[in-house]
UniProtKB/Swiss-Prot annotation:
InterPro entries: Ankyrin_rpt (IPR002110), Ankyrin_rpt-contain_sf (IPR036770), PGG_dom (IPR026961). This is Ankyrin repeat-containing protein At5g02620. The keyword Mitochondrion does not apply. It is a multi-pass membrane protein. Keywords: ANK repeat, Membrane, Phosphoprotein, Repeat, Transmembrane, Transmembrane helix. It is found in: Membrane. SUPFAM superfamilies: Ankyrin repeat. The modification Phosphoserine is found at residue 508. GO terms for cellular component: endoplasmic reticulum; plasma membrane. PANTHER family: ANKYRIN REPEAT PLANT PROTEIN, PROTEIN PHOSPHATASE 1 REGULATORY SUBUNIT.
Amino acid sequence: MKEIKKTMTKQMTARRDDTPLHTAVREGKTDLLLEMIGEHDGVELKELLAEQNQSGETALYVAAEYGYTDMVKILMKHSDSVLAGTKAKNGFDAFHIAAKNGNLQVLDVLIEANPELSFTFDSSKTTALHTAASQGHGEIVCFLLDKGVDLAAIARSNGKTALHSAARNGHTVIVKKLIEKKAGMVTRVDKKGQTALHMAVKGQNTEIVDVLMEADGSLINSADNKGNTPLHIAVRKNRAEIVQTVLKYCEVSRVAVNKSGETALDIAEKTGLHEIVPLLQKIGMQNARSIKPAEKVEPSGSSRKLKETVSEIGHEVHTQLEQTGRTRREIQGIAKRVNKMHTEGLNNAINSTTLVAILIATVAFAAIFNVPGQYTDDPKDVPPGYSLGEARAAPRPEFLIFVVFDSFALFISLAVVVVQTSVVVIERRAKKQMMAIINKLMWMACIMISVAFVSLSFVVVGEKEKPLAVGVTAIGALIMVSTLGTMCYWVIANRIEGSKSSPASMMSDPELADSKHNRKLYAV
């Protein structure tokens, strides 16, 4: 039996396209998880944690779904807000799936690590609070509401709030908690124009009807976009007990006609609801054709409409403020990441320049002691006019040019190495200024070492093959002039672009609009 179960697990894992990390989390192997995390760091670790299976689930999502609190704690230590908010293909992230499954401890860990996770929602704009309310997880709803976050006011894309869903699914405790937290929610309508009472009468929980009526008695005659009152809806759904509960309130209208020209009695008679018809007739409910035109009333009054409008405006303003705050935080986060990328780029450039400077210094130093023809190092064989240790090519003008330019290349490179290893610059602008100067010095060093190489090539090829050395000089000159010409063009273009964009940057967000942040070239 164990072997069969093991085989089934492997097959399911293969179908999910789980990574080893997913599998370790799914099987609850905390030690293996720690071992895998310990084998990676930095970018590699982030990539490991960000990997998704076929369903778009990250390892954090799986841990939250299964309710592995310890694993969630471990993973959150190495996860940023972007990774923690990664959504699976079902539109849920780790926080949302934990709320759906009623994992309170997991939610506590997630919201403590990143409070903004409570604002996450799926493709239909369903928040974790909404999902928890629909599922009847009272502890989760209380937990989210007690965090002081006004999630209760956020509606789904169809306009339904958490109160609508809780009322429809008959979760009395949750309805009470939501009303206690935000009493004005009872008048909120969805895109169909229906209140929470309209949703409650579709179910079978009479207690919720009483709770909502206690909160706001005017709901009894509120009409949706089709003119249906809660009584119309209850009759259409054949909810006899709900109809009895609604009829006990004296405020209920007996002459309410919907946009189809029907009273609740018309609907009951048309659909053959013999149990409900007597209940309606008992309170004096009439058919629409029996009601005099003067007696017909629109179920929703202007005062209720005004209240709903004010409530909706307040909700929209609050939502916009929350969205603005979140957007601002996201922009600041992006700016920080961009700044980090710029800093890393500068550091990489500094390290690369140091290596190149060391290389040029090494080559220049070695070249002076390895000239063609070597030196007069034999005391018994010193040519006339030479001294012991003198280079055999020393009298030639090409050698003189080589020595001068090779020395320049050596000492310029050494100067760059000394500056790079001695000066510690923290501020980014100062780093860029230093890199700009060092880059110019490296240009000079490259030119010097190139001239030294070309001059020495004349010595190497000899007089007979002098055209070959001339060809090498032409090729080198062409390449160096083209390269330096292009670099100079970039310098000028970059500075012109910076001068043009500076006035605009003063009028925008300093976090992102700094023209220097948007340049593609640095320290040229």
